[in-house]
Amino acid sequence: MKKEDLRIVYMGTPDFAVESLRALVEGGYNVVGVITMPDKPMGRHGSVLQPSAVKQYAVSVGLPVLQPEKLKDEAFLEELRALRADLQIVVAFRMLPEVVWNMPRLGTFNLHASLLPQYRGAAPINWAVINGDTETGVTTFFLTHEIDTGKIIRQRHLPIADTDDVETVHDALMAMGARLVTETVDLLLDGKTDAIPQEEFYKDAAELRPAPKIFKDTCHIDWNQPVKNIYDFVRGLSPYPAAWTELISEDGKRLALKIYQAEKRPAEHNFPVGSIHTDHKSYIDVAVKDGFLRLRSLQLAGKKRMNITDFLNGFKQIAEYTVG
């Protein structure tokens, strides 16, 4: 079968999923429909509906779009069957019921932003950086009953530099993933379906690191950690949702502070953990047990994000605070 004859239904929602869809469209593959989330209410009183990034791209190139509220809704399933897909591709969408992923004759494959079986879950890029990994990657795998556990089709590896954050890794994986999606389609067109069970990639489930969804409490900095761990934590949450702490004044006043960029400065010292040290012009150092975290870009609650010089110009009393 030629790629022009293979009927593909694509499922995805955020920016990360746009690149793979674009690669399929521009590569001449036959995308017959796109499934994405319903438009999201925005603005005051939810009066404005914001379409997903995938919908915006799909509409711009004239692709049919379906936006089901419920994936088991019979009206949606009838519309999906009418597309007569040979293959479904999922990139950053949602968990599919079997009635959906088992519909096409070639099955449904997913692009996941980790080297499965590591980092199964909703936030694989964040957790790889938070944990200080020096490598991550992308995986295509067939969907099955349990989330992120299906047979692996192909993987590509990406080094993580010590200066990378979630944004840089996300963008690199987005481009790499788009290439892997088209490569995977080509393999399936050639009849090469030698997918490998994930159990062959590890000996003990205890070796596996999860990638659970990140909540606000997840992002709170623990200043009792080593400086490298805190540094990795900051870059693993930057720019979104951002690591945060509280500035605590001598009288107990607390101000929420997001930290977007920092430097790790290992050193021996006798300062209390959480104490703040600054020249009031160009740097803020927070003492931790094995050094200092030098803050580079931050944001007080209710204020805009600032570099350290601008922040110090407007916050002269910073040294009177500690962090916690």
UniProtKB/Swiss-Prot annotation:
EC number: 2.1.2.9
CDD domains in the cross-refs: FMT_core_Met-tRNA-FMT_N, Met_tRNA_FMT_C
Origin: domain of life: Bacteria
Pfam families: Formyl_trans_C (PF02911), Formyl_trans_N (PF00551)
Top EC group: transferase
PANTHER family membership: METHIONYL-TRNA FORMYLTRANSFERASE, METHIONYL-TRNA FORMYLTRANSFERASE, MITOCHONDRIAL
Protein name per its UniProtKB record: Methionyl-tRNA formyltransferase
